[in-house]
Amino acid sequence: LTPINTRTFYWVSQVGMLAGTAVYVNAGTQLARLESLSGILSPGLLGSFALLGIFPLLAKKLVGLIQARKVYAGWPKPARFERNLVVIGAGAGGLVTAYIAAAVKAKVTLIEGHKMGGDCLNYGCVPSKALIRSARFMKTVREAETLGIANASADADFGRIMARVQNVVRQVEPHDSVERYSKLGVEVIQGHARITSPWTVEIDSEAGKQTLSTRAIVIASGAAPVIPKIPGIGSVKHVTSDTIWSLTEKPERLLVLGGGPIGCELAQAFAGIGCQVTLLARSGIMGKEDADAVALVEAGLAADGVRLLKGLDTVRCEIVEGEQRLIVAQEGTEQRVEKALPFDVLLCATGRKARVSGFGLEELGIPLTKAGTIEVNEYLQTRYPNIYACGDVAGPFQFTHTAAHQAWYAAVNALFAGFKSFKADYRVIPWVTFTSPEVARVGLSENEAKALGIAHEVTRYNLDDLDRAIAESAAHGFVKVLTPPGKDSILGATIVGEHAGELLAEFTLAMKHGLGLNKILGTIHPYPTWSEAAKYAA
């Protein structure tokens, strides 16, 4: 069973079991000496049973110390530390980590090589939702006739819309600014960080290079968009979800690669402000969601003018007579018939990859997962127990709220590991795709429950029966709840429709605190509101 020599295996096993054997034999000896009921309370017996309980914990701690000593071998430990914690990256994960450390008066340094706030503030959540707001207003204007309003019209000024997007980012910036975190007690350094040992971080900033010694390090370097390796892509105008916000002129023809949440949201938003949008999703859109949810989103995309193409392989990019084109071919066919898709701008939304290069991880031998994220344990520790990772760089989720969630565990464990450590809890993770209609989910989907072999019942409430939805001419979508057979505890909930993201919070709260559908049913919901959908589903 093992490559160890039989004799070696035998004596190592015997020696390894000596301590445990001694503890158990001692407990048995004490039990054998019992002569009366009063003997149960004897110090010897109580001590023996206490040792039985404590021994596994002590053994686990000892093994951990031995493993740590082996990992740290060859790295000189500083005699003193200048910081309690150094945080690399000022996105959601890094900001929350630094905030928590400052709140307990720890000496913490936050290092950011680019913009405070990370991708969410500057390129992701905030700008995309600002753009979606403009697109949804244009949709309201187009549907004004259904509300009894005649001759409504509006022109989408692309330049002004993009300027508003940047203005929204500027309004949110103070929440994540250097000034705010400095006032909280965080030392913020704008520069590039490199881990040079388990306890030292080298910082290259405008002021020059410096090295800080620290008891613990948290890596929160985030992720970056992946640009697909398509022949000729470098010769055409292509952008990512990070760089698209620099556009100042409207792309008349926008070709979007990728059918994930980012691709779907941006495709629909740009279509909403007047772009001709083609969405190329090889395996279909939103692969993690159930078919009934996907069908409604596909209908919403089509209604807003998005042309959805599935089952196509990308072959190459080319420019013919000044026209940029993506050449595609039908997936899986022997005789590949090529087809040209002309575009003005190509948006690559084919996923994001953890930022792991340039931080010294290779030199320290910190391993990565198959997904390219930093390998961490349940406490978010890397190979080195005092080096942690959280957010997109650690996975498995790429959401701002999960980065902040992980940051609490990373910060607390980094600061108090000697006293108490906490395992990161991923049991109740909500997420929302901000298409029209929105798709919001927490817990299991039907597909996941079936794949895992989990017995379940499905309760479905269609929003075309909800009075408020009918009043707003938005009576489309559903609330779907999975429960164990014959029980009301919630395994998962999926909501598709207007305000789905807001409605999901009630189910998230219920799952987090073990509240079943009967508790939701027994709660008064004001009439007429969207929140009643949760009660009717219950």
Each language-model region and where it sits:
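Hydrophobic alpha-helical membrane segments of integral membrane proteins
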Residues: L1-L31, V63-I66
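Multi-pass membrane proteins that catalyze or facilitate reactions on polyprenyl-/lipid-phosphate substrates
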Residues: N26-A73
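Core beta-strand elements of the Rossmann-like FAD/NAD(P) dinucleotide-binding domain
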Residues: F81-R83, A207-A216, E334-V345, R383
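N-terminal Rossmann-like FAD-binding beta1-loop-alpha1 element of flavoenzymes
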Residues: R83-L110, G263-G272
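Flexible, glycine-rich terminal cap/loop adjacent to redox cofactors
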Residues: I88, A102-H114, V126, A130-F137, ...
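Glycine-rich flavin
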Residues: I100-A106, I111-K250, S283-G287, D292-D304, ...
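Glycine-rich dinucleotide-binding loop and its adjacent helix/turn
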Residues: C125, S221-Q276, L280, D304, ...
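FAD-site-proximal beta/loop scaffold in flavoenzymes
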Residues: G234-K250, L341-K420
